[in-house]
């Protein structure tokens, strides 16, 4: 008698790749035009937060297996390296689809209903620019902590999941000299000039809202928002007064946040958990997100410092970290583009009773005509 074995790899699907398919289904909700616009924004945000957690825990665990030379295959017949290769391919496709949805559907739809997201600070009107610069001076500048790297200062520790702006800066006297060079000598000086460039970074403060509402257009009624990182980029020269800013671009890292705790070996489980939670902020960098138009010199420096492979580098064609869309859902004036709030039906039979249990004992409440 021929007995079929159901343990063959072809009968199983890898758990991690299956999860990526799940997150893609979440994103598909954001692409469904039958769902109200602001509800679709929430699904884009959820896709982002899901992917962050997936990388910090599941992908991190697989990388730990690779570092430990653990080669055992899972039920689908894939070892850790094969799973990581498959995950990289699928998640890059997912992120591309996510930003296609954001750029081609969400942003134009928001503008159509009266809300414009200003994606580049160069597109600000004169009045908007004045408002933004004033907001920077009064609210943002006091909470910024710029950090630089040079021969005396190592590369700063970048915290997990934080949004940062990296910059290449050059001392002003060096910059003036380089501009005064003869054109014939300029090409020969390029390598020397690049050596003079220094790396600087500033964290986008989480204590401030991710997006700022700008004054409403009185004629059209159109409302405008700009992201916090765009305001900082516009004014980043004010943080480095002795330098010329050559370029500035946002970036973001995901670190290994998988907890590895041996409950049997830990003498104090609570202290061990607290210790592991602190380490999560400084674990190995497993994913780097950068603006797709980032300067190649800056990108090369980040790749080197974070020791990132091409598989774990995500070039983003839009704002990094789309979880801010969840906060945008709370904006007033767009209720018609949201699912109406559920209002539970009142039960008159229970409204005027001092003791509802006495009333319940009289019979099934749902059978009474006074329920609605």
Identify the meaning behind each predicted range.
Residues 1-372:
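N-terminal localization/anchoring segments of enzymes in phospholipid and broader phosphate metabolism
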């Amino acid at each position: 008698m021929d007995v079929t074995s159901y343990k063959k790899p072809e009968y199983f699907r890898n758990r991690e790749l299956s999860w990526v398919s799940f997150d893609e289904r979440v994103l598909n909700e954001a692409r469904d035009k039958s769902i109200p616009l602001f509800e679709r924004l929430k699904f884009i945000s959820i896709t982002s937060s899901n992917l962050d957690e997936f990388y910090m825990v599941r992908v991190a665990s697989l990388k730990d297996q690779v570092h430990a030379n653990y080669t055992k295959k899972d039920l689908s017949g894939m070892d850790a390296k094969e799973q990581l290769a498959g995950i990289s391919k699928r998640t890059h496709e997912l992120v591309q689809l996510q930003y296609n949805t954001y750029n081609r559907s969400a942003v134009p739809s928001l503008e159509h209903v009266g809300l414009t997201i200003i994606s580049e600070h160069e597109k600000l009107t004169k009045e908007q620019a004045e408002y933004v610069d004033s907001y920077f001076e009064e609210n943002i500048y006091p909470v910024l902590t710029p950090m630089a790297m040079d021969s005396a200062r190592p590369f700063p520790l970048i915290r997990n999941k934080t949004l940062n702006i990296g910059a290449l800066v050059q001392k002003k006297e060096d910059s003036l000299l380089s501009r005064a060079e003869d054109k014939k000598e300029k090409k020969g000086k390029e390598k020397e000039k690049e050596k003079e460039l220094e790396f600087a970074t500033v964290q986008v403060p989480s204590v401030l809202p991710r997006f700022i509402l700008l004054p409403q257009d009185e004629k059209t009624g159109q409302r405008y928002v700009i992201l916090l990182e765009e305001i900082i980029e516009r004014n980043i020269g004010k943080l480095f007064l002795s330098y010329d800013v050559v370029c500035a671009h946002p970036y973001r890292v995901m670190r290994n946040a998988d907890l590895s705790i041996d409950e049997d070996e830990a003498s104090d489980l609570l202290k061990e958990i607290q210790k592991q939670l602190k380490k999560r902020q400084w674990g190995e960098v497993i994913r780097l997100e950068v603006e797709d138009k980032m300067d190649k010199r800056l990108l090369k420096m980040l790749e080197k410092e974070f020791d990132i492979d091409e598989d774990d580098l995500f070039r983003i064609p839009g704002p990094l970290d789309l979880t801010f869309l969840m906060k945008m859902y709370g904006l007033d004036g767009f209720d018609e583009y949201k699912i109406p709030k559920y209002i539970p039906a009142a039960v008159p039979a229970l409204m005027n009773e001092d003791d509802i249990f006495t009333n319940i004992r009289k019979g099934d409440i749902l059978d009474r005509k006074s329920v609605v």
